[in-house]
């Protein structure tokens, strides 16, 4: 992403760029062109059969011979069914990660890439146990599904015709499939299962719409923070539900490593705290989550009830992590090999957080430099953002993404709990939170995060 006013662009196609010099894409053909090729081939085969031309190979003879060398008429060919699975439209341009030199790439939407496929499993806070299902929805991606726009041919069962149709299948399919050998599948970190769907368009994903997040994204697209958040492309309907069309932040990375960092000193709204006090609701599921981390954490009364309230659980959750001490906490990490690390619930001290980032970046000094520069750009932009000063930002994350080609990016994500302040009120985002002042500690956390990475860079 760039500072405000700098055009954002789409990531370079996978297989291009510094990681694979000299590689070129296979020729691109639209579905319409492929259909014409297919129909022309079928017509040629049918015409040859109707004219009684001999087969070039494998012509059978009675008893192994054709009398007098005369050709035997070939059976009428069975034309395979052509199935076009999707549109041939080119994906719209959307912002992407920087190139090897750290420059944000210009818009380029001339190539249709494989859409990613969402996993139906949820790793809460990148965890394998759903300990933090109340946290906001974040996504990672690691493998792609079959491209929309593929052309599939159902081959004839006639052995004699099989080779003809196999040639056509190859002719039609290879231009579409060959540029995209490496595929990834979605992994959802934190949040509720089923929040995301594949968009079916390169560079985009769908997230289940909520009124608060829709409100925020519309306003963010007109704010200086536009280049620091996923590009928003409107709302679409899928299976009777509304979804937000968002930029796929992993598009253009090769085997991305991803870290989700939840920002702020709290992940609950003040109004949630008030409502919980007025109408307390005991949660057995949260009691079990608390017990799984620390059997001594519940009080005697909570042990007797075998339940806790949500505010009690969330305040405890933030107290055992770095949220209250540093203004952020690490939710989870997905490595390039697809493995997820989620054991950060008690990662609290600056030293512990530093070790986690060292492990995440694996000593890549170039990635560290780019992360640090990007965080400083984001902080500068937040400090002049009218949207930021007039909103309480709760449950939002910074998403860190890098790959082995030293591409790296950081974005603000998740605005489902971001709420506007009463007219005339603004936040400092660094002042300590006291109930009633609505301070979230976002910039406090970002200052500490930048300090930790700056210390790493000096080593």
Curated annotation (Swiss-Prot):
Chain spans, region Calmodulin-binding: 285-293
Residue sites binding substrate per the record: 262, 283, 310-317, 417
GO molecular function, one term: calcium/calmodulin-dependent protein kinase activity
Activity control, per UniProt: Activated by calcium/calmodulin.
Residues that bear Phosphoserine: 135, 195
UniProt xrefs under InterPro entries: IPK (IPR005522), IPK_sf (IPR038286)
Region span, Disordered: 1-26, 49-164
Biased composition regions of type Low complexity, renumbered to the chain: 116-132
GO BP, one annotated term: modification of postsynaptic actin cytoskeleton
Protein family (similarity comment): Belongs to the inositol phosphokinase (IPK) family.
Protein name: Inositol-trisphosphate 3-kinase A
Organism in which the protein naturally occurs: Rattus norvegicus
Lineage of origin: Eukaryota, Metazoa, Chordata, Craniata, Vertebrata
